[in-house]
Structures are given as C-alpha cells and as structure tokens.
Design a protein with these regions (language model features):
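Glycine-rich active-site loop/strand segments that organize a redox cofactor
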Residues: 80-110
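Active-site substrate-recognition segment that forms the wall
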Residues: 124-132, 217-219, 235-275, 279-369
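Helical element adjacent to the flavin cofactor pocket in flavoenzyme catalytic cores
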Residues: 147, 154-155, 179-239
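C-terminal catalytic lobe of FAD-dependent flavoproteins
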Residues: 314-436
Length: 443
C-alpha cells in the first residue's frame, strides 16, 4: 500500500522554553528552499531523528541524507524535557514494579545502549551541554512515597541493579531542603541541558548529512520508487524516508488512534545570587525524581538555576493554551515554595510545555510501515534514552542490519487502539486528574 501522507500539526511555541532561551543565540537556519534529491530523509529533528541520521551516515558514508525539522532543533520537544537520560524501568508506583526480570533487564540494556551512544558523541565532539553522569535521587515527601520507594528498591534488587538509601539528613545535605523525608539514589542516570545537546548533535552531524530547520513537511507523495516530500519553500525527492516524529505521529497516518500526546510542563528560575545560594546550601548540581510518577521533578543546575517540572494535560491537537501555561506556572510556583521556603525572592523566569508520546499499553512503533516508510515513534515518557536508542537502531534496521536490540523492538507491542473522541479525551483527562490528586504531597 502506497498513498499520500499529509501532515496537519506542527510544533507550537507552547510557552518559553527556558533551556533554549538561556542559551546564546542560535546560528541561522538552513531551510528547504528549492528542489533537491537525497538517498534518505529523516523527518523530525529530535533525539530520535538526530541519532537516526547520524547512524545512517556512519553505516552508509556514501549515501546522501537529509534531516528535516519543522522548527529549530533544540527549541521543540526534545529540547523541552527535564534532561534525564533514564536507564532503569520507569514506573515505580506499583508494588510489583516490573513485569519480569528478563523483560526489565532487556529494557535496561536498550536504554543504556542509547545513553552510551550519545555520551560517546558528546565526548568525541566536545559538545557543551552540561553532560553529567551523576545519577539521580528518587525522593519521597511522605509515608506513601516512602512505601513506593521501598517497592522500587525491591524491583531493583530483583534485577540486580545498585542503589543507595539516604535518610532525611542525607538528602537535605544534597538538596538544601528538609522537604524530602528520604531518598533512593541510582547511579546510572545521566543528565544534560537538553536544548544545548540537541543543538550540538545537529552541529556535529557527519558530512553526508544536510540539516534543514524551519521546514515542516506538509505532504509525502509516492512517485515511482521514490518519495516526494513537500515543503512551503520546495521539495525533496528521496529513495527512503524514516519518520521520527514521536507525539506528532498521533495526528497523521495509520497508527494515530493508539498514540496519546500528553503534555507535561516545566519552569526555570532566574539564576540565584550568592546570598540565595548560601541560603539554599546543598550541592551545586543534583537531580530529583518524585517517588510518585505524577509528582514534581526538580533539578539544580550548575548555572544556579532550579528547574521544576510537574502537571500533565492530554492535548490531542499537540498544542497548549495560555490557560494551560498559567495553571502550570501556578502549580510550579506552589511546588517551588513548598520545597524552598528560604528562596522566596527567586522568580520563575520561564514556563513551557512539551508533549510526551504515550500509549495505553506502553506500546511503540518501530520498523517498516505498510506504506513503505520506516518509523521509530513512541518513547512513553523516556524520550532521551529510548529515543536515542530507537533512532540508532531504526537506521541499522533500515540498512538491513539485525541484532538483539533490533529484534526486541520489532517484537514490542504496537500501541493499543483507543475509543473514539471525545470518549478518549474524557477518559485520559480523568485518569490524569485522579493520579495527580493521588500524588498529594509529592506535587
């Protein structure tokens, strides 16, 4: 089956991305402004697309490759997250924690594969993105959170992963706040400034990769044994196409009813002054994940800013409103004040949202579609680690390579179909509300 594929939704501003805004101005973007030909086109300049384009170039140095992004690389979704390369299975809320030892270990291998790939690139090219292999703290704020961490620890023990317990005094020595009652430290997580990383990955692509930004694809049209990609300013004719569009895949072609674009929101403070740094205490850089998945993620950055992330909203049109952003900012200010009462004069400078691509069964899309296009879509909340790994692996698969990780992705379930709108809107939004309410003090 080979039909036209139309694109209707593109990245929206969705607030002011503090990661992007706090960087020096970006260099001028190269846009699609004429007709050109490439062997491969990768659609989507997030972490998945950046890794897919690079891996294609590494394995096929004689091929011509275009990487096309609708906005600026680093300003949209991949540069809007909290900057965690998470290596472990993500859901710590359930008592059983994980499915099976074998499946969880496979997920760890998959996620670490992506982390290792990107870390090597950062080191080889000296990408300035505050990459840190300092691990993360899973912190609790009450007895319910402490119980969740105990279940998490049981799961880690079953799969043979290292961790360390911290009591209230120990986690306060790290964070400067006595808000947390205790924490569990896991060493395998890396953290970054995500917008800086995306810019750096784009700027260091191999010579046979051409990067186009501010160039949304409006239509992919089959023409003989090629594909014609249409843009406002021109066209690209390609032999093969890889889709790495994550949440935006929910708005086009073949799998849309199984994908859930769920926004999460973050705020970044202004830099603290010397007096404020002294009042806070703790260490210069740390990363805290809440014991409840719907709770508040907090990072202290080496720039003396603090990043706060919480609140979720199902937005199937892949954009948020001013009211969404205002609500998120209010929640962030409240969460910040509860954790850092000593920093009452520290303002939130930026607030923004970004879409996750979730599915009801943690399914994802990987491989060759019925229309002949390749795809790697659906990171289920672990965009940096899963996206980097699946991007690298889809390139290998498309070039005919196979390995245990490729086979693992080919066997994973597809996203489970959902009820029609507006039923799914009501169901997902109600579920989010209930889970946020249940998070309680963790928010």
């Amino acid at each position: 089956m080979s039909t036209n594929l139309e694109f209707a939704r593109f990245p929206a501003p969705d607030g002011m991305n503090g990661w992007w805004e706090s960087l020096p101005p970006a260099t001028d973007a190269r846009t699609v402004a004429s007709e050109s030909r490439f062997d491969w086109v990768v659609v989507g300049g997030g972490i998945t697309g950046l890794c897919a384009a690079r891996r294609l170039a590494e394995l096929a140095p004689g091929a011509s490759i275009a990487l096309v992004e609708a906005d600026r690389i680093g300003r949209t979704t991949a540069g809007r997250n909290s900057g965690f390369f998470v290596d472990l299975p993500h859901d710590i809320s359930s008592e059983s924690y994980s499915r099976s030892i074998e499946e969880d270990r496979a997920d760890v291998r998959f996620q670490r594969h992506g982390i290792d790939y990107v870390r090597d690139i950062v080191r080889r090219f000296g990408i300035d993105c505050d990459w840190r292999d300092d691990g993360k703290f899973h912190a609790s704020a009450n007895k319910k959170g402490a119980a969740a961490l105990a279940h998490f620890a049981d799961g880690l023990t079953r799969i043979g992963e290292a961790f360390e317990w911290l009591d209230q005094a120990a986690i306060k020595a790290v964070t400067g706040t006595d808000f947390y009652t205790g924490a569990l430290f896991t060493p395998g997580c890396s953290t970054v400034q995500p917008a800086a990383l995306m810019r750096g990955l784009a700027a260091t692509q191999p010579d046979n990769v051409t990067v186009f930004e501010l160039s949304p694809v409006t239509l992919i049209e089959p023409r003989g044994d090629t594909r014609v990609l249409h843009f406002a300013g021109g066209t690209i004719v390609a032999k093969q196409v890889i889709l790495c569009t994550n949440a935006y895949a929910a708005t086009f072609g073949m799998h849309s009813n199984g994908l859930l674009p769920v926004y999460t929101f973050a705020s970044l403070t202004r830099p603290m002054n010397a007096d404020e740094v002294a009042k806070l205490g703790g260490t210069r850089s740390w990363a805290v994940i809440p014991a409840d998945p719907m709770g508040t993620t907090v990072r202290r950055l080496i720039t003396d800013r603090i990043c706060v992330r919480n609140h979720f909203a199902f937005r199937p049109d892949v954009k948020v409103s001013a009211a969404d952003l205002a609500k998120a900012r209010h929640l962030h200010q409240r969460s910040f004040a509860r954790r850092f009462p000593m920093l009452g004069g520290v303002e939130l400078e930026y607030t923004w949202g970004g879409p996750l691509c979730l599915s009801a069964n943690n399914g994802a899309l990987f491989g060759k579609r019925a229309d002949g296009l390749y795809e790697a879509i659906g990171c289920n909340g672990l965009g940096l680690s899963r996206g980097s790994s699946s991007g690298k692996l889809i390139a290998e698969y498309a070039l005919g390579e196979s390995n245990s990780l490729v086979q693992q992705l080919l066997k994973q379930p597809h996203p489970r179909p959902l009820p029609v709108r507006p039923l799914v809107d009501l169901a997902v939004s109600a579920t989010i509300w209930a889970k946020e309410f249940s998070a309680g003090a963790e928010l």
